Each structure stands twice: as C-alpha cells, then as structure tokens.
C-alpha cells in the first residue's frame, strides 16, 4: 500500500512539473536585409522616431516581413546596415554625410493569445566612443494604429549596451485584444564619427507559452489515492 501511494505521489509531482511554462523564440533568423529609403529617415535613426515613421517605413501592407535598412537622409548611396547570417548579427556603420543609419524588422506573431509573456532583448557593441544608439519595439492594431511597446537611447561611451525589456501585463493584454499580429523592431545609430561602427547581436523576441495544467489526470490520481486510503481505514 505504501509503495502504491508513493508511486501515485510521484506521478502527481511529475504532472505538476509538466505544467511549467515554455519559452519560444519568435523572432525569425536574419537571412538578409533590404535597402528601403524613407523621406523622413533622419528620425528613424534617432530618438525622434515616431509611430507614423515606423508605419510609413515598415508598415505598408505590401511590404513583406523581414529586415530593412536606410540611412538618415534616405539615400542608399551613402551605405547601409549589413548582416552576418553566420552569427546572426547586424552592423550599423556611422557614415559622414548622413544623419545616421538604422535597421528595422517587420514580423508576424502567430497565435499571440497562447502567450502569457513577451520579452525583447539585444546586445550592441560599439567600435568607438562617438554617436548615439536607439532601439524601439512597436505593434500594429486592427484599426491601423502603431503602438509603442518600448524605446531606449544611449550615448555611446564605448561599452556594450545590453537591452532587455519584459512587456507589462497591460501591454500584452492590449496586444491580444487589439493587435493584428504585426510587430516591428528598429535599431538606429546617429551622430557618430565615420568608421565607428556598432554590431548588434542576440536580437530576440521571446514568448512565454504556458503549458495547460493536466487537471483531469491529476484529479484521477488524487481520487485513486483517496479511495485507497479509505479502503485501508475500513480494513483497519
């Protein structure tokens, strides 16, 4: 009897363990980056970025999901951000003659209702000590409104910039209620000396996917344990 009850308890413990949350990487691999000019690109590369800028640059319905880049004056002749698919990184070059450079991602989150948490993270390593770096994350609503989730700016001091942001419960709830699944991330560099490049790595948008509680199995094992204890008392 004791051995059987012990097995039941171990089974319950195992079921409880399977109810833990799982983390899923939602951001797609960096496969390429496309030059895409914008007439107010100077704001995209800096802290003055607006919802309208993101919507007009990345949000058009005909624009496919993926990574895009532009310079601060919208002219690709000055150069652009580049990607390294082997180590999944993006290089932001500082170039004379332009207000800056940025890289932006348009992506889709499927089944957002299944997630109990979302978090954005990245690591930026500069090669010099000039310029300013920014990042921002946004989502699109079914009504066509672009909503900011987070934004940050840092004056370059030559040290790495490690970013991590967890969406609040209110933000995630609003995304589930109003979002259309489209999410955008923009990373920019402005005001730097020519040749002072930055490397952006470990770009991530993780979702916490809650595993449903195996309630039926748990109740069944609890019922069996209770029945065996009752039979034991009757025999005693």
Model-inferred region functions:
Residues 22-95:
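N-terminal targeting leaders for non-cytosolic proteins
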Residues 88-113:
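Short beta-strands within extracellular/lumenal beta-sheet-rich domains
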Residues 112-114, 125-133, 193:
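Extended, low-complexity, turn-rich repeat/linker tracts enriched in Gly/Pro/Ser/Thr and Asp/Glu
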Residues 213-230:
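A short, hydrophobic C-terminal helix/tail in secreted or cell-surface proteins
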């Amino acid at each position: 009897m004791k051995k059987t009850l012990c097995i039941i308890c171990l089974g319950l413990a195992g079921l409880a363990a399977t109810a833990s949350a799982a983390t899923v990487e939602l951001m797609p691999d960096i496969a390429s980056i496309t030059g895409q000019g914008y007439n107010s690109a100077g704001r995209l590369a800096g802290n003055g970025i607006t919802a309208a800028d993101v919507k007009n640059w990345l949000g058009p319905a005909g624009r496919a999901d993926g990574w895009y880049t532009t310079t601060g004056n919208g002219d690709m002749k000055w150069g652009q951000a580049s990607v390294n698919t082997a180590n999944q990184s993006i290089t932001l070059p500082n170039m004379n003659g332009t207000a800056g450079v940025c890289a932006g991602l348009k992506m889709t989150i499927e089944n957002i209702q299944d997630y109990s948490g979302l978090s954005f993270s990245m690591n930026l390593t500069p090669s010099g000590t000039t310029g300013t770096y920014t990042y921002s994350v946004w989502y699109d609503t079914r009504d066509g409104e672009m909503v900011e989730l987070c934004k940050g700016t840092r004056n370059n001091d030559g040290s790495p910039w490690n970013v991590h942001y967890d969406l609040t419960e209110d933000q995630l709830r609003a995304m589930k209620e109003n979002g259309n699944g489209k999410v955008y991330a923009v990373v920019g560099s402005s005001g730097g000396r020519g040749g002072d490049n930055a490397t952006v790595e470990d770009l991530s948008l993780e979702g916490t996917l809650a595993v449903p509680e195996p309630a039926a199995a748990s109740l069944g094992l609890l019922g069996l344990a209770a029945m065996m204890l009752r039979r034991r008392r009757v025999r005693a």
